[in-house]
Curated annotation (Swiss-Prot):
Record's cofactor remark: Binds 1 Mg(2+) ion per subunit.
Residues noted as binding Mg(2+) in the record, renumbered to the chain: 21
Binding site for ATP: 17-22, 123, 160
Gene3D superfamilies registered for this protein in UniProt: P-loop containing nucleotide triphosphate hydrolases (3.40.50.300)
Catalytic activity entry: shikimate + ATP = 3-phosphoshikimate + ADP + H(+)
Summary of the function given for this chain in its UniProt record: Catalyzes the specific phosphorylation of the 3-hydroxyl group of shikimic acid using ATP as a cosubstrate.
Keyword entries, A-Z: Amino-acid biosynthesis, Aromatic amino acid biosynthesis, ATP-binding, Cytoplasm, Kinase, Magnesium, Metal-binding, Nucleotide-binding, Transferase
Organism this protein belongs to: Halorhodospira halophila (strain DSM 244 / SL1) (Ectothiorhodospira halophila (strain DSM 244 / SL1))
Record's protein name: Shikimate kinase
Names of required cofactors: Mg(2+)
Length: 177
């Protein structure tokens, strides 16, 4: 059996509430890589919150900022990057993610997303009268995009972040290098 080499760039995609940030930290720790959350990077650069950007610039303004950050982060080596849930809606982001590293789709059913995000006021797209319907709509729109760009798909239900991170490593080890 050939020796497995840790990818130098791992990008996590998936819906809000999938655990991209939590699992990403664990995965980076397991593999000795740096963890970067693209939304946190946007907030650090702008000095304002994601909801503020949505309020002032709208989703299009946010997506433009996100695309610039994705372009930069996907060029770094030795990283696990957790992308925002909607990063895949921009074709250029999908191209960069797919071309520059290994993409892991953290699949999470809507019921689990709802449970994990129900008290989070920092998610502009969930500020609606029916968050469950909104999550279902977003997943219906984005699931094909996540799957299109993903090298591997790992479900995040039924396990702690560390066990999900281990499942990702196992899935990656099964990938051709």
């Amino acid at each position: 059996m050939a020796h497995w080499r840790t990818p130098s760039r791992i990008f996590l995609v998936g819906p809000m509430g999938a655990g991209k940030s939590t699992v990403g930290r664990e995965l980076a720790n397991l593999l000795g890589l740096e963890f970067i959350d693209s939304d946190a990077a946007i907030e650090a650069r702008t000095g304002v919150s994601i909801p503020w950007i949505f309020d002032i610039e709208g989703e299009a303004g946010f997506r433009a900022r996100e695309a610039a950050v994705i372009d930069e982060l996907t060029g770094r080596d030795g990283v696990v990057v957790a992308t925002g849930g909607g990063a895949v809606t921009t074709p250029a982001n999908r191209d960069l993610l797919g071309a520059r590293g290994v993409v892991v789709y953290l699949y999470t059913p809507v019921s689990v997303q709802l449970q994990r995000t129900r008290h989070d006021t920092n998610r502009p797209l969930l500020q609606s009268d029916d968050p469950e319907a909104r999550l279902q709509s977003l997943l219906a729109e984005r699931d094909p995009l996540y799957r299109e760009v993903a090298d591997v798909v790992v479900e995040t239900t039924g396990g702690r972040a560390r066990s999900v991170a281990r499942r990702i490593v196992e899935a990656l080890q099964g990938q051709p290098s």
